[in-house]
Amino acid sequence: MLLPTQTSWVILAGGQASRMGGKDKGLVELNGSPLIQYVINKLSQQDVSITINANRNLDSYQAFAPVVSDSFPDYPGPLGGIHAGLKNASTDWVGFVPCDSPQISDDLVERFCAAVKEDSDILVAHDGEFKQPVFTLFHKRVLPKLEAFLERGDRKIILLYKECVTEYVDFSDAPNCFVNLNTPEELTQFGTLQ
């Protein structure tokens, strides 16, 4: 079985945050702490190294963890961050989570590691109803395929998953761990619920 220490994890914070009014989502505060701090706290308990993918406010993010930026222009979405994370990783297996999901499961890394098969390229979380495409674990061997995918202008992460050996990791018992906060209204509502 793959061990958590044999993986590294990248928090995706490189988007444009258009639904958050352009504010950098990872740095937006929830109950006095930046959203990214919640994600870091959850991952830090799981015995993995953490990197952040960001394309602005780099100094702010570097206060939390090492930062890698997209090398493809024009914000290619989560795949740009996945590409940057894979390209700069020191491990063969690299996991990715979004910066705006404060309730990541305490055993997220362990579940992903347990689901790896010998021929797996990519593992994707599934909440029992929906695929959670940016909660994912990639093997570095996907990098050439990902680069070709991005170079031809493809941006839909689900299409890449169809080109690779993709497994799904069951989180049907913990669907709330995928709550993500995309708008100021969602942030306010979530903060009130806590």
Swiss-Prot record:
Catalytic activity field: Mo-molybdopterin + GTP + H(+) = Mo-molybdopterin guanine dinucleotide + diphosphate
Gene Ontology MF annotations: GTP binding; metal ion binding; molybdenum cofactor guanylyltransferase activity
Domain of life the protein comes from: Bacteria
EC identifiers of the protein: 2.7.7.77
Binding site for Mg(2+): D100
Disulphide bond pairs: none
Quaternary structure and interacting proteins, as annotated: Monomer.
HAMAP family, A to Z: MobA
Domain-related comment: The N-terminal domain determines nucleotide recognition and specific binding, while the C-terminal domain determines the specific binding to the target protein.
Family, per entry: Belongs to the MobA family.
Protein name as catalogued: Molybdenum cofactor guanylyltransferase
Species whose genome carries this gene: Vibrio atlanticus (strain LGP32) (Vibrio splendidus (strain Mel32))
Lineage: Bacteria, Pseudomonadati, Pseudomonadota, Gammaproteobacteria, Vibrionales
